[in-house]
């Protein structure tokens, strides 16, 4: 009887070991997936929370002219005033719209959304959140009733080969989406 139990155990233990190891691997995978979901949810919330302010539109915290070599060395570039818009892009928008605050606000909002394609997208959900914010910014541009060259803003934001490649690569996450469902403009400027 003892010998027959040992013989059965010899044949049964390996499948049991394999099942136990498989279960542990599955649990580890699921824990990692839950962390990824939390990371995505936090990133999406941060994307939707990023707004330009009236101080940004008025130029209260206007940054100094950045060193171009240092600014172009990374995808993010330099953003000294931490408003989500690269300093060279922000200064170019102020130069193009010096007296029209409404147009400047819409252009800054659009530039901020375009910058997020480079810095905030890492999966389909984050791409969708950025696309919704870009759509809001586009509607804000339409509300200004001013001729705003949005293609020029895209070119300002993606002005190096690395930035162009990153933007193109991030469009691999493209998916359908709706609107953000809020007021299109971050600021109410008249």
Regions of interest found by a model, annotated:
Residues 2-82, 88-190:
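Calcium-binding acidic motifs and repeat modules
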């Amino acid at each position: 009887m003892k010998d027959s139990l040992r013989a059965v155990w010899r044949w049964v233990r390996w499948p049991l070991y394999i099942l136990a190891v498989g279960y542990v691997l599955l649990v580890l995978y699921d824990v990692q997936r839950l962390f990824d979901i939390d990371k995505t949810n936090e990133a999406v919330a941060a994307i939707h929370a990023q707004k330009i302010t009236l101080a940004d539109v008025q130029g209260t915290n206007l940054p100094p002219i950045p060193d171009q070599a240092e600014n172009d060395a990374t995808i993010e570039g330099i953003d000294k005033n931490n408003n989500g818009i690269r300093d060279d892009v922000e200064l170019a928008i102020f130069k193009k719209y010096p007296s029209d605050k409404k147009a400047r606000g819409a252009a800054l909002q659009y530039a901020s959304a375009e910058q997020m394609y480079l810095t905030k997208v890492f999966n389909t959900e984050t791409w969708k959140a950025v696309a919704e914010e870009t759509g809001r910014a586009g509607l804000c541009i339409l509300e200004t009733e001013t001729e705003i060259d949005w293609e020029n803003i895209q070119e300002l934001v993606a002005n190096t080969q690395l930035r162009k490649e990153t933007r193109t690569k991030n469009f691999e996450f493209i998916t359908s989406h709706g609107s953000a469902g809020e007021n299109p403009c971050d600021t109410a400027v008249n």
